[in-house]
Amino acid sequence: MKKVIVIGINHAGTSFIRTLLSKSKDFKVNAYDRNTNISFLGCGIALAVSGVVKNTDDLFYSNPEELKQMGANIFMSHDVTNIDLIKKQVTVRDLTSNKEFTDQFDQLVIASGAWPICMNVENKVTHKPLEFNYTDKYCGNVKNLISCKLYQHALTLIDSFRKDKTIKSVAIVGSGYIGLELAEAAWLCKKQVTVIDLLDKPAGNNFDHEFTDELEKVMQKDGLKLMMGCSVKGFVVDSTNNVVKGVETDKGIVNADLVIQSIGFRPSTKFVPKDQNFEFIHNGSIKVNEFLQALNHKDVYVIGGCAAIYNAASEQYENIDLATNAVKSGLVAAMHIIGSNQVKLQSIVGTNALHIFGLNLAACGLTEQRAKKLGFDVGISVVDDNDRPEFMGSYDKVRFKLVYDKKTLRILGAQLLSWNTNHSEIIFYIALAIQKQMLLTELGLVDVYFLPHYNKPFNFVLATVLQALGFSYYIPKK
C-alpha cells in the first residue's frame, strides 16, 4: 500500500483526499494542517458580517471526522517545516506539544495554500505564515488590526462589525474582491468606510476603466470614501493600550476604529526547499504540469493556492488563488495518483465574478492593460446593449467587453457588467473559448439560441464580436 502525505487540508487538500479515498482504498493518507478546522468558505465572511449568512457553521462543508471515516489519518494543529525529497520524508511540528518528528512518503501532495500579505507597523511587507497564529485575533497582536481568511477572522469581524458599539469607522487597505466585499459589509452595518489602495480604481486588477468607473461611481454615491492611488506608510497605534487608531498614507492619516488588511495573498511555500529543483515563479508558487505534478518531480503534486498553473490567456505559468482552481486541482491530482491520465487541468484563465452594491460583474482572461503590458497587439470591443428585444417591454442594460490580439484575432479576455438581471454565467463560455485558443471569427459563429424572453438574435456577446470584426451595422443604436 502506497503512502501519500498531504500538506494542508483546506479546499484543495480536502478535494484531493475525498477524491482519492472515494475512488481507491489502496493508499494510506497522512494529512497535516496548522489550523484547527478545515473547509471553511472564506467567500462567506463578508456575507456573515453583513448578516446574510446567519450561522457561520454553515460555511463549512467538511470536517476532520468525515475524512477520518473515509480512511485518512488527520493531524490538525501540525505544521510541516521541511521536505527532504532524497529521504522522501517531511519534518512536522506538533503545535500543541511543540515536538518534532519525521514522516515518510511515497507520494507527496503540497496543498499548503496561501496566507494574507500583511504589513507590520513599520510598513515592511513580509511573508511569515505564523506572523499571527490561527488562535490570534489580531495582526501582530495590535487590537482591531486584522486580516481576513479564516473562520477565526470571521468571528472577530462579526464581533467588531455587529457587536462592538465603539467601532464606528473602518479603513480597508486593498480594493480587491475581499476588500470590496468587506467594504460593502461595513457599509451595510452603518459604518463609516474608507478604502485605500495603490491602484487607481477599485478592482483595477480584474477590470478596465469601463467597469471600475461604474463601480467607483456607485460606491461614492453610497457614501464610501475611496483613496485610490494612495500608498500606505504605516499604522497609527495607541501605544498605551496597543489599539490601532488609523492608517498613515502619503495623502495623510485616515482615522479608523478598525483596520482590515486585504492586500492580497502569497503562497505558503517557505518550507519547500529551494535546492531540490522545484521551479518557482516570482511569488513563490510552484510550477506544475497538467496533472498537477511539480515540474521535475513526478512524485510531488502541488495543488490549490500554492500552485502555478499554465494560463491559456497569458501563455505563462500563473498563481491564481481561487477556490474553483483549488478543488479542481485536488480532483485532478487524486485521479492521476490513482492511475488516470484522462483527467487533466490543462489551463486556467482566472474566471471570476463579483456582486457588490447592486452591480453584477464577471471577468476572465486578460484585461486590456495587462494584455498591453504582456506585449500583445491589443484590440478591444465594448458594447452597451439591452439584454432582450425592446418590443418585450422590459429589459435590462448590459455592458460587455472583449480583449483580443489584433494580429491573430485570438480572444484574450472578457469583462461583463449588468445592473439588474444577472448575466455573469455568460463568462463561462468565454473562458472556455480562451482555454481553447478560439478566434473572434469562431466565437462569432457559436451556435447560440434566440428566444425573446431571454436575449436578442445578435445578443450582447455576438454584437461585441461583430463590432470587433467591423460589422458595425449589427450594433444597437445608442
UniProtKB/Swiss-Prot annotation:
InterPro entries: FAD-bd_OxRdtase, FAD/NAD-bd_sf, FAD/NAD-binding_dom, FAD/NAD-linked_Rdtase_dimer_sf, Pyr_nucl-diS_OxRdtase_dimer
Superkingdom field: Bacteria
UniProt-listed Enzyme Commission number(s): 1.6.3.4
Key words of the record: FAD, Flavoprotein, NAD, Oxidation, Oxidoreductase, Redox-active center
Cofactor comment: Binds 1 FAD per subunit.
Cofactor(s), by name: FAD
Phenotype when the gene is knocked out: Probably essential, it was not disrupted in a global transposon mutagenesis study.
Pfam families listed in its UniProt record: Pyr_redox_2, Pyr_redox_dim
Amino acids binding FAD: 8-12, 33, 43, 80, 111-114, 149, 177, 295-305, 322-324, 450
Coiled coil: none
Active site (record annotation): H11 (proton acceptor), C43 (redox-active)
Location of Cysteine sulfinic acid (-SO2H) modifications: C43
Signal peptide interval: none
Annotated Gene3D superfamilies: 3.30.390.30, FAD/NAD(P)-binding domain
GO MF, one annotated term: NADH dehydrogenase (ubiquinone) activity
Family of the protein in this entry: Belongs to the class-III pyridine nucleotide-disulfide oxidoreductase family.
Function, as annotated: Catalyzes the four-electron reduction of molecular oxygen to water.
The name this protein goes by in its record: NADH oxidase
Organism, scientific name: Mycoplasma genitalium (strain ATCC 33530 / DSM 19775 / NCTC 10195 / G37) (Mycoplasmoides genitalium)
